[in-house]
Amino acid sequence: MADEKTFRIGFIVLGLFLLALGTFLMSHDRPQVYGTFYAMGSVMVIGGIIWSMCQCYPKITFVPADSDFQGILSPKAMGLLENGLAAEMKSPSPQPPYVRLWEEAAYDQSLPDFSHIQMKVMSYSEDHRSLLAPEMGQPKLGTSDGGEGGPGDVQAWMEAAVVIHKGSDESEGERRLTQSWPGPLACPQGPAPLASFQDDLDMDSSEGSSPNASPHDREEACSPQQEPQGCRCPLDRFQDFALIDAPTLEDEPQEGQQWEIALPNNWQRYPRTKVEEKEASDTGGEEPEKEEEDLYYGLPDGAGDLLPDKELGFEPDTQG
């Protein structure tokens, strides 16, 4: 590399000398001579500069991905690689990749053992408080056999009752509640925090079918059907919900009094007299005609209903 650098510098200096010589010859009026020196000097200077610039960039060596690439490397590089690998293989690592320390082993031993947990399936009717009572031969928590606290206190025996309610057990419990508490006493007393309204569609359809029903008949028709003896409201699961239209204790029927059954489409009413039926038939025929007239706007179609000319406010055109 040093020899090449010296040669490049000498090549550039020689080109500059030829340019200076051509300039000197040009002053003596000899154009056929100084032109040759000028051309040779310019080529040598430009070539030397380009050559030097190309040497500034690092050389790239392409190594094929083959097992024979070791022959391309120099013996010095191969020796360095072998020495480094041998040193790594001979010197043991200061710490193995995974070492189980004694602190971790002690922590694993200090964890509680859950092998003493027992499972007992009980039905809904059985008393779960018996599980909470300690047995006679069971040692108390916090005391060992010697009467003093020791390492045995960490894994002392404990019992806890875990009650899981299943669907079958709930159905059995509901049946027992309905059998043991008949009548309206099973319903929770007091106002419910949540309430829901019944659908008003049934009310609209009922008004359309019987437009002449009296308010007394409507109140009786809206009252729900009297349920047989038993719980009228849902069980404890739905005690927070209640219907606003449900009858209260004051509205409950007395003994010997019958309520009408409220149906969604056909409303039942008490038997009316012949006079009431006749009035209902007369008014029932007139109301549809009035409703049809209300549907139209403007002047009616009949010739007799037209307004007279005096009320219209203008005179008819008499010009012929």
UniProtKB/Swiss-Prot annotation:
Q: Show the Pfam families listed in the entry.
A: Barttin
Question: PTM comment for this protein?
Answer: Palmitoylation is necessary for activation of plasma membrane-inserted CLC-K/barttin channels.
Documented effect of changing residue 12 to T: In BARTS4A; reduces the number of CLCNKA channels at the plasma membrane but has no effect on channel permeation or gating; no effect on CLCKNB channel function
Which cysteine-cysteine pairs are annotated as disulfide bonds in the entry?
none
The residue spans the entry assigns to the Extracellular side of the membrane are as follows 27-32
* Region span, Regulates channel membrane trafficking and ion conductance: 1-72
Tissue specificity here reads:
Expressed primarily in kidney. Expressed in specific nephron segments and in the stria vascularis of the inner ear.
> Which residue stretches does the UniProt record annotate as biased composition, category Basic and acidic residues?
167-177
Q: Which residues carry this modification: Phosphoserine?
A: 110, 168
Q: What are the protein's GO molecular function terms?
A: chloride channel activity; chloride channel regulator activity
The record's keywords, sorted A to Z, are: Bartter syndrome, Cell membrane, Deafness, Disease variant, Lipoprotein, Membrane, Palmitate, Phosphoprotein, Transmembrane, Transmembrane helix
From the UniProt record, list the coiled-coil ranges: none
Q: Listed GO cellular component terms?
A: basolateral plasma membrane; plasma membrane; protein-containing complex
Task: Write out the biased-composition intervals (Acidic residues).
Answer: 284-295
| Predominant location | membrane
Q: Where is this region: Disordered?
A: 167-233, 250-320
Q: What is the effect of changing residue 47 to R?
A: In BARTS4A; atypical; decreases the number of channels; almost complete loss of ion conductance
Tell me what topology the record assigns in the membrane: Multi-pass membrane protein
Subunit structure, briefly? Interacts with CLCNK channels. Forms heteromers with CLCNKA in the thin ascending limb of Henle and with CLCNKB in the thick ascending limb and more distal segments.
| Protein purpose | Regulatory subunit of anion-selective CLCNKA:BSND and CLCNKB:BSND heteromeric channels involved in basolateral chloride conductance along the nephron to achieve urine concentration and maintain systemic acid-base homeostasis, and in the stria vascularis of the inner ear to establish the endocochlear potential necessary for normal hearing. Most likely acts as a chaperone that allosterically regulates proper sorting of CLCNKA:BSND and CLCNKB:BSND channels at the basolateral plasma membrane domain and functional switch to ion conducting state.
Q: Which disease is it linked to?
A: Bartter syndrome 4A, neonatal, with sensorineural deafness: A form of Bartter syndrome, an autosomal recessive disorder characterized by impaired salt reabsorption in the thick ascending loop of Henle with pronounced salt wasting, hypokalemic metabolic alkalosis, and varying degrees of hypercalciuria. BARTS4A is associated with sensorineural deafness.
- For this entry, the protein name equals Barttin
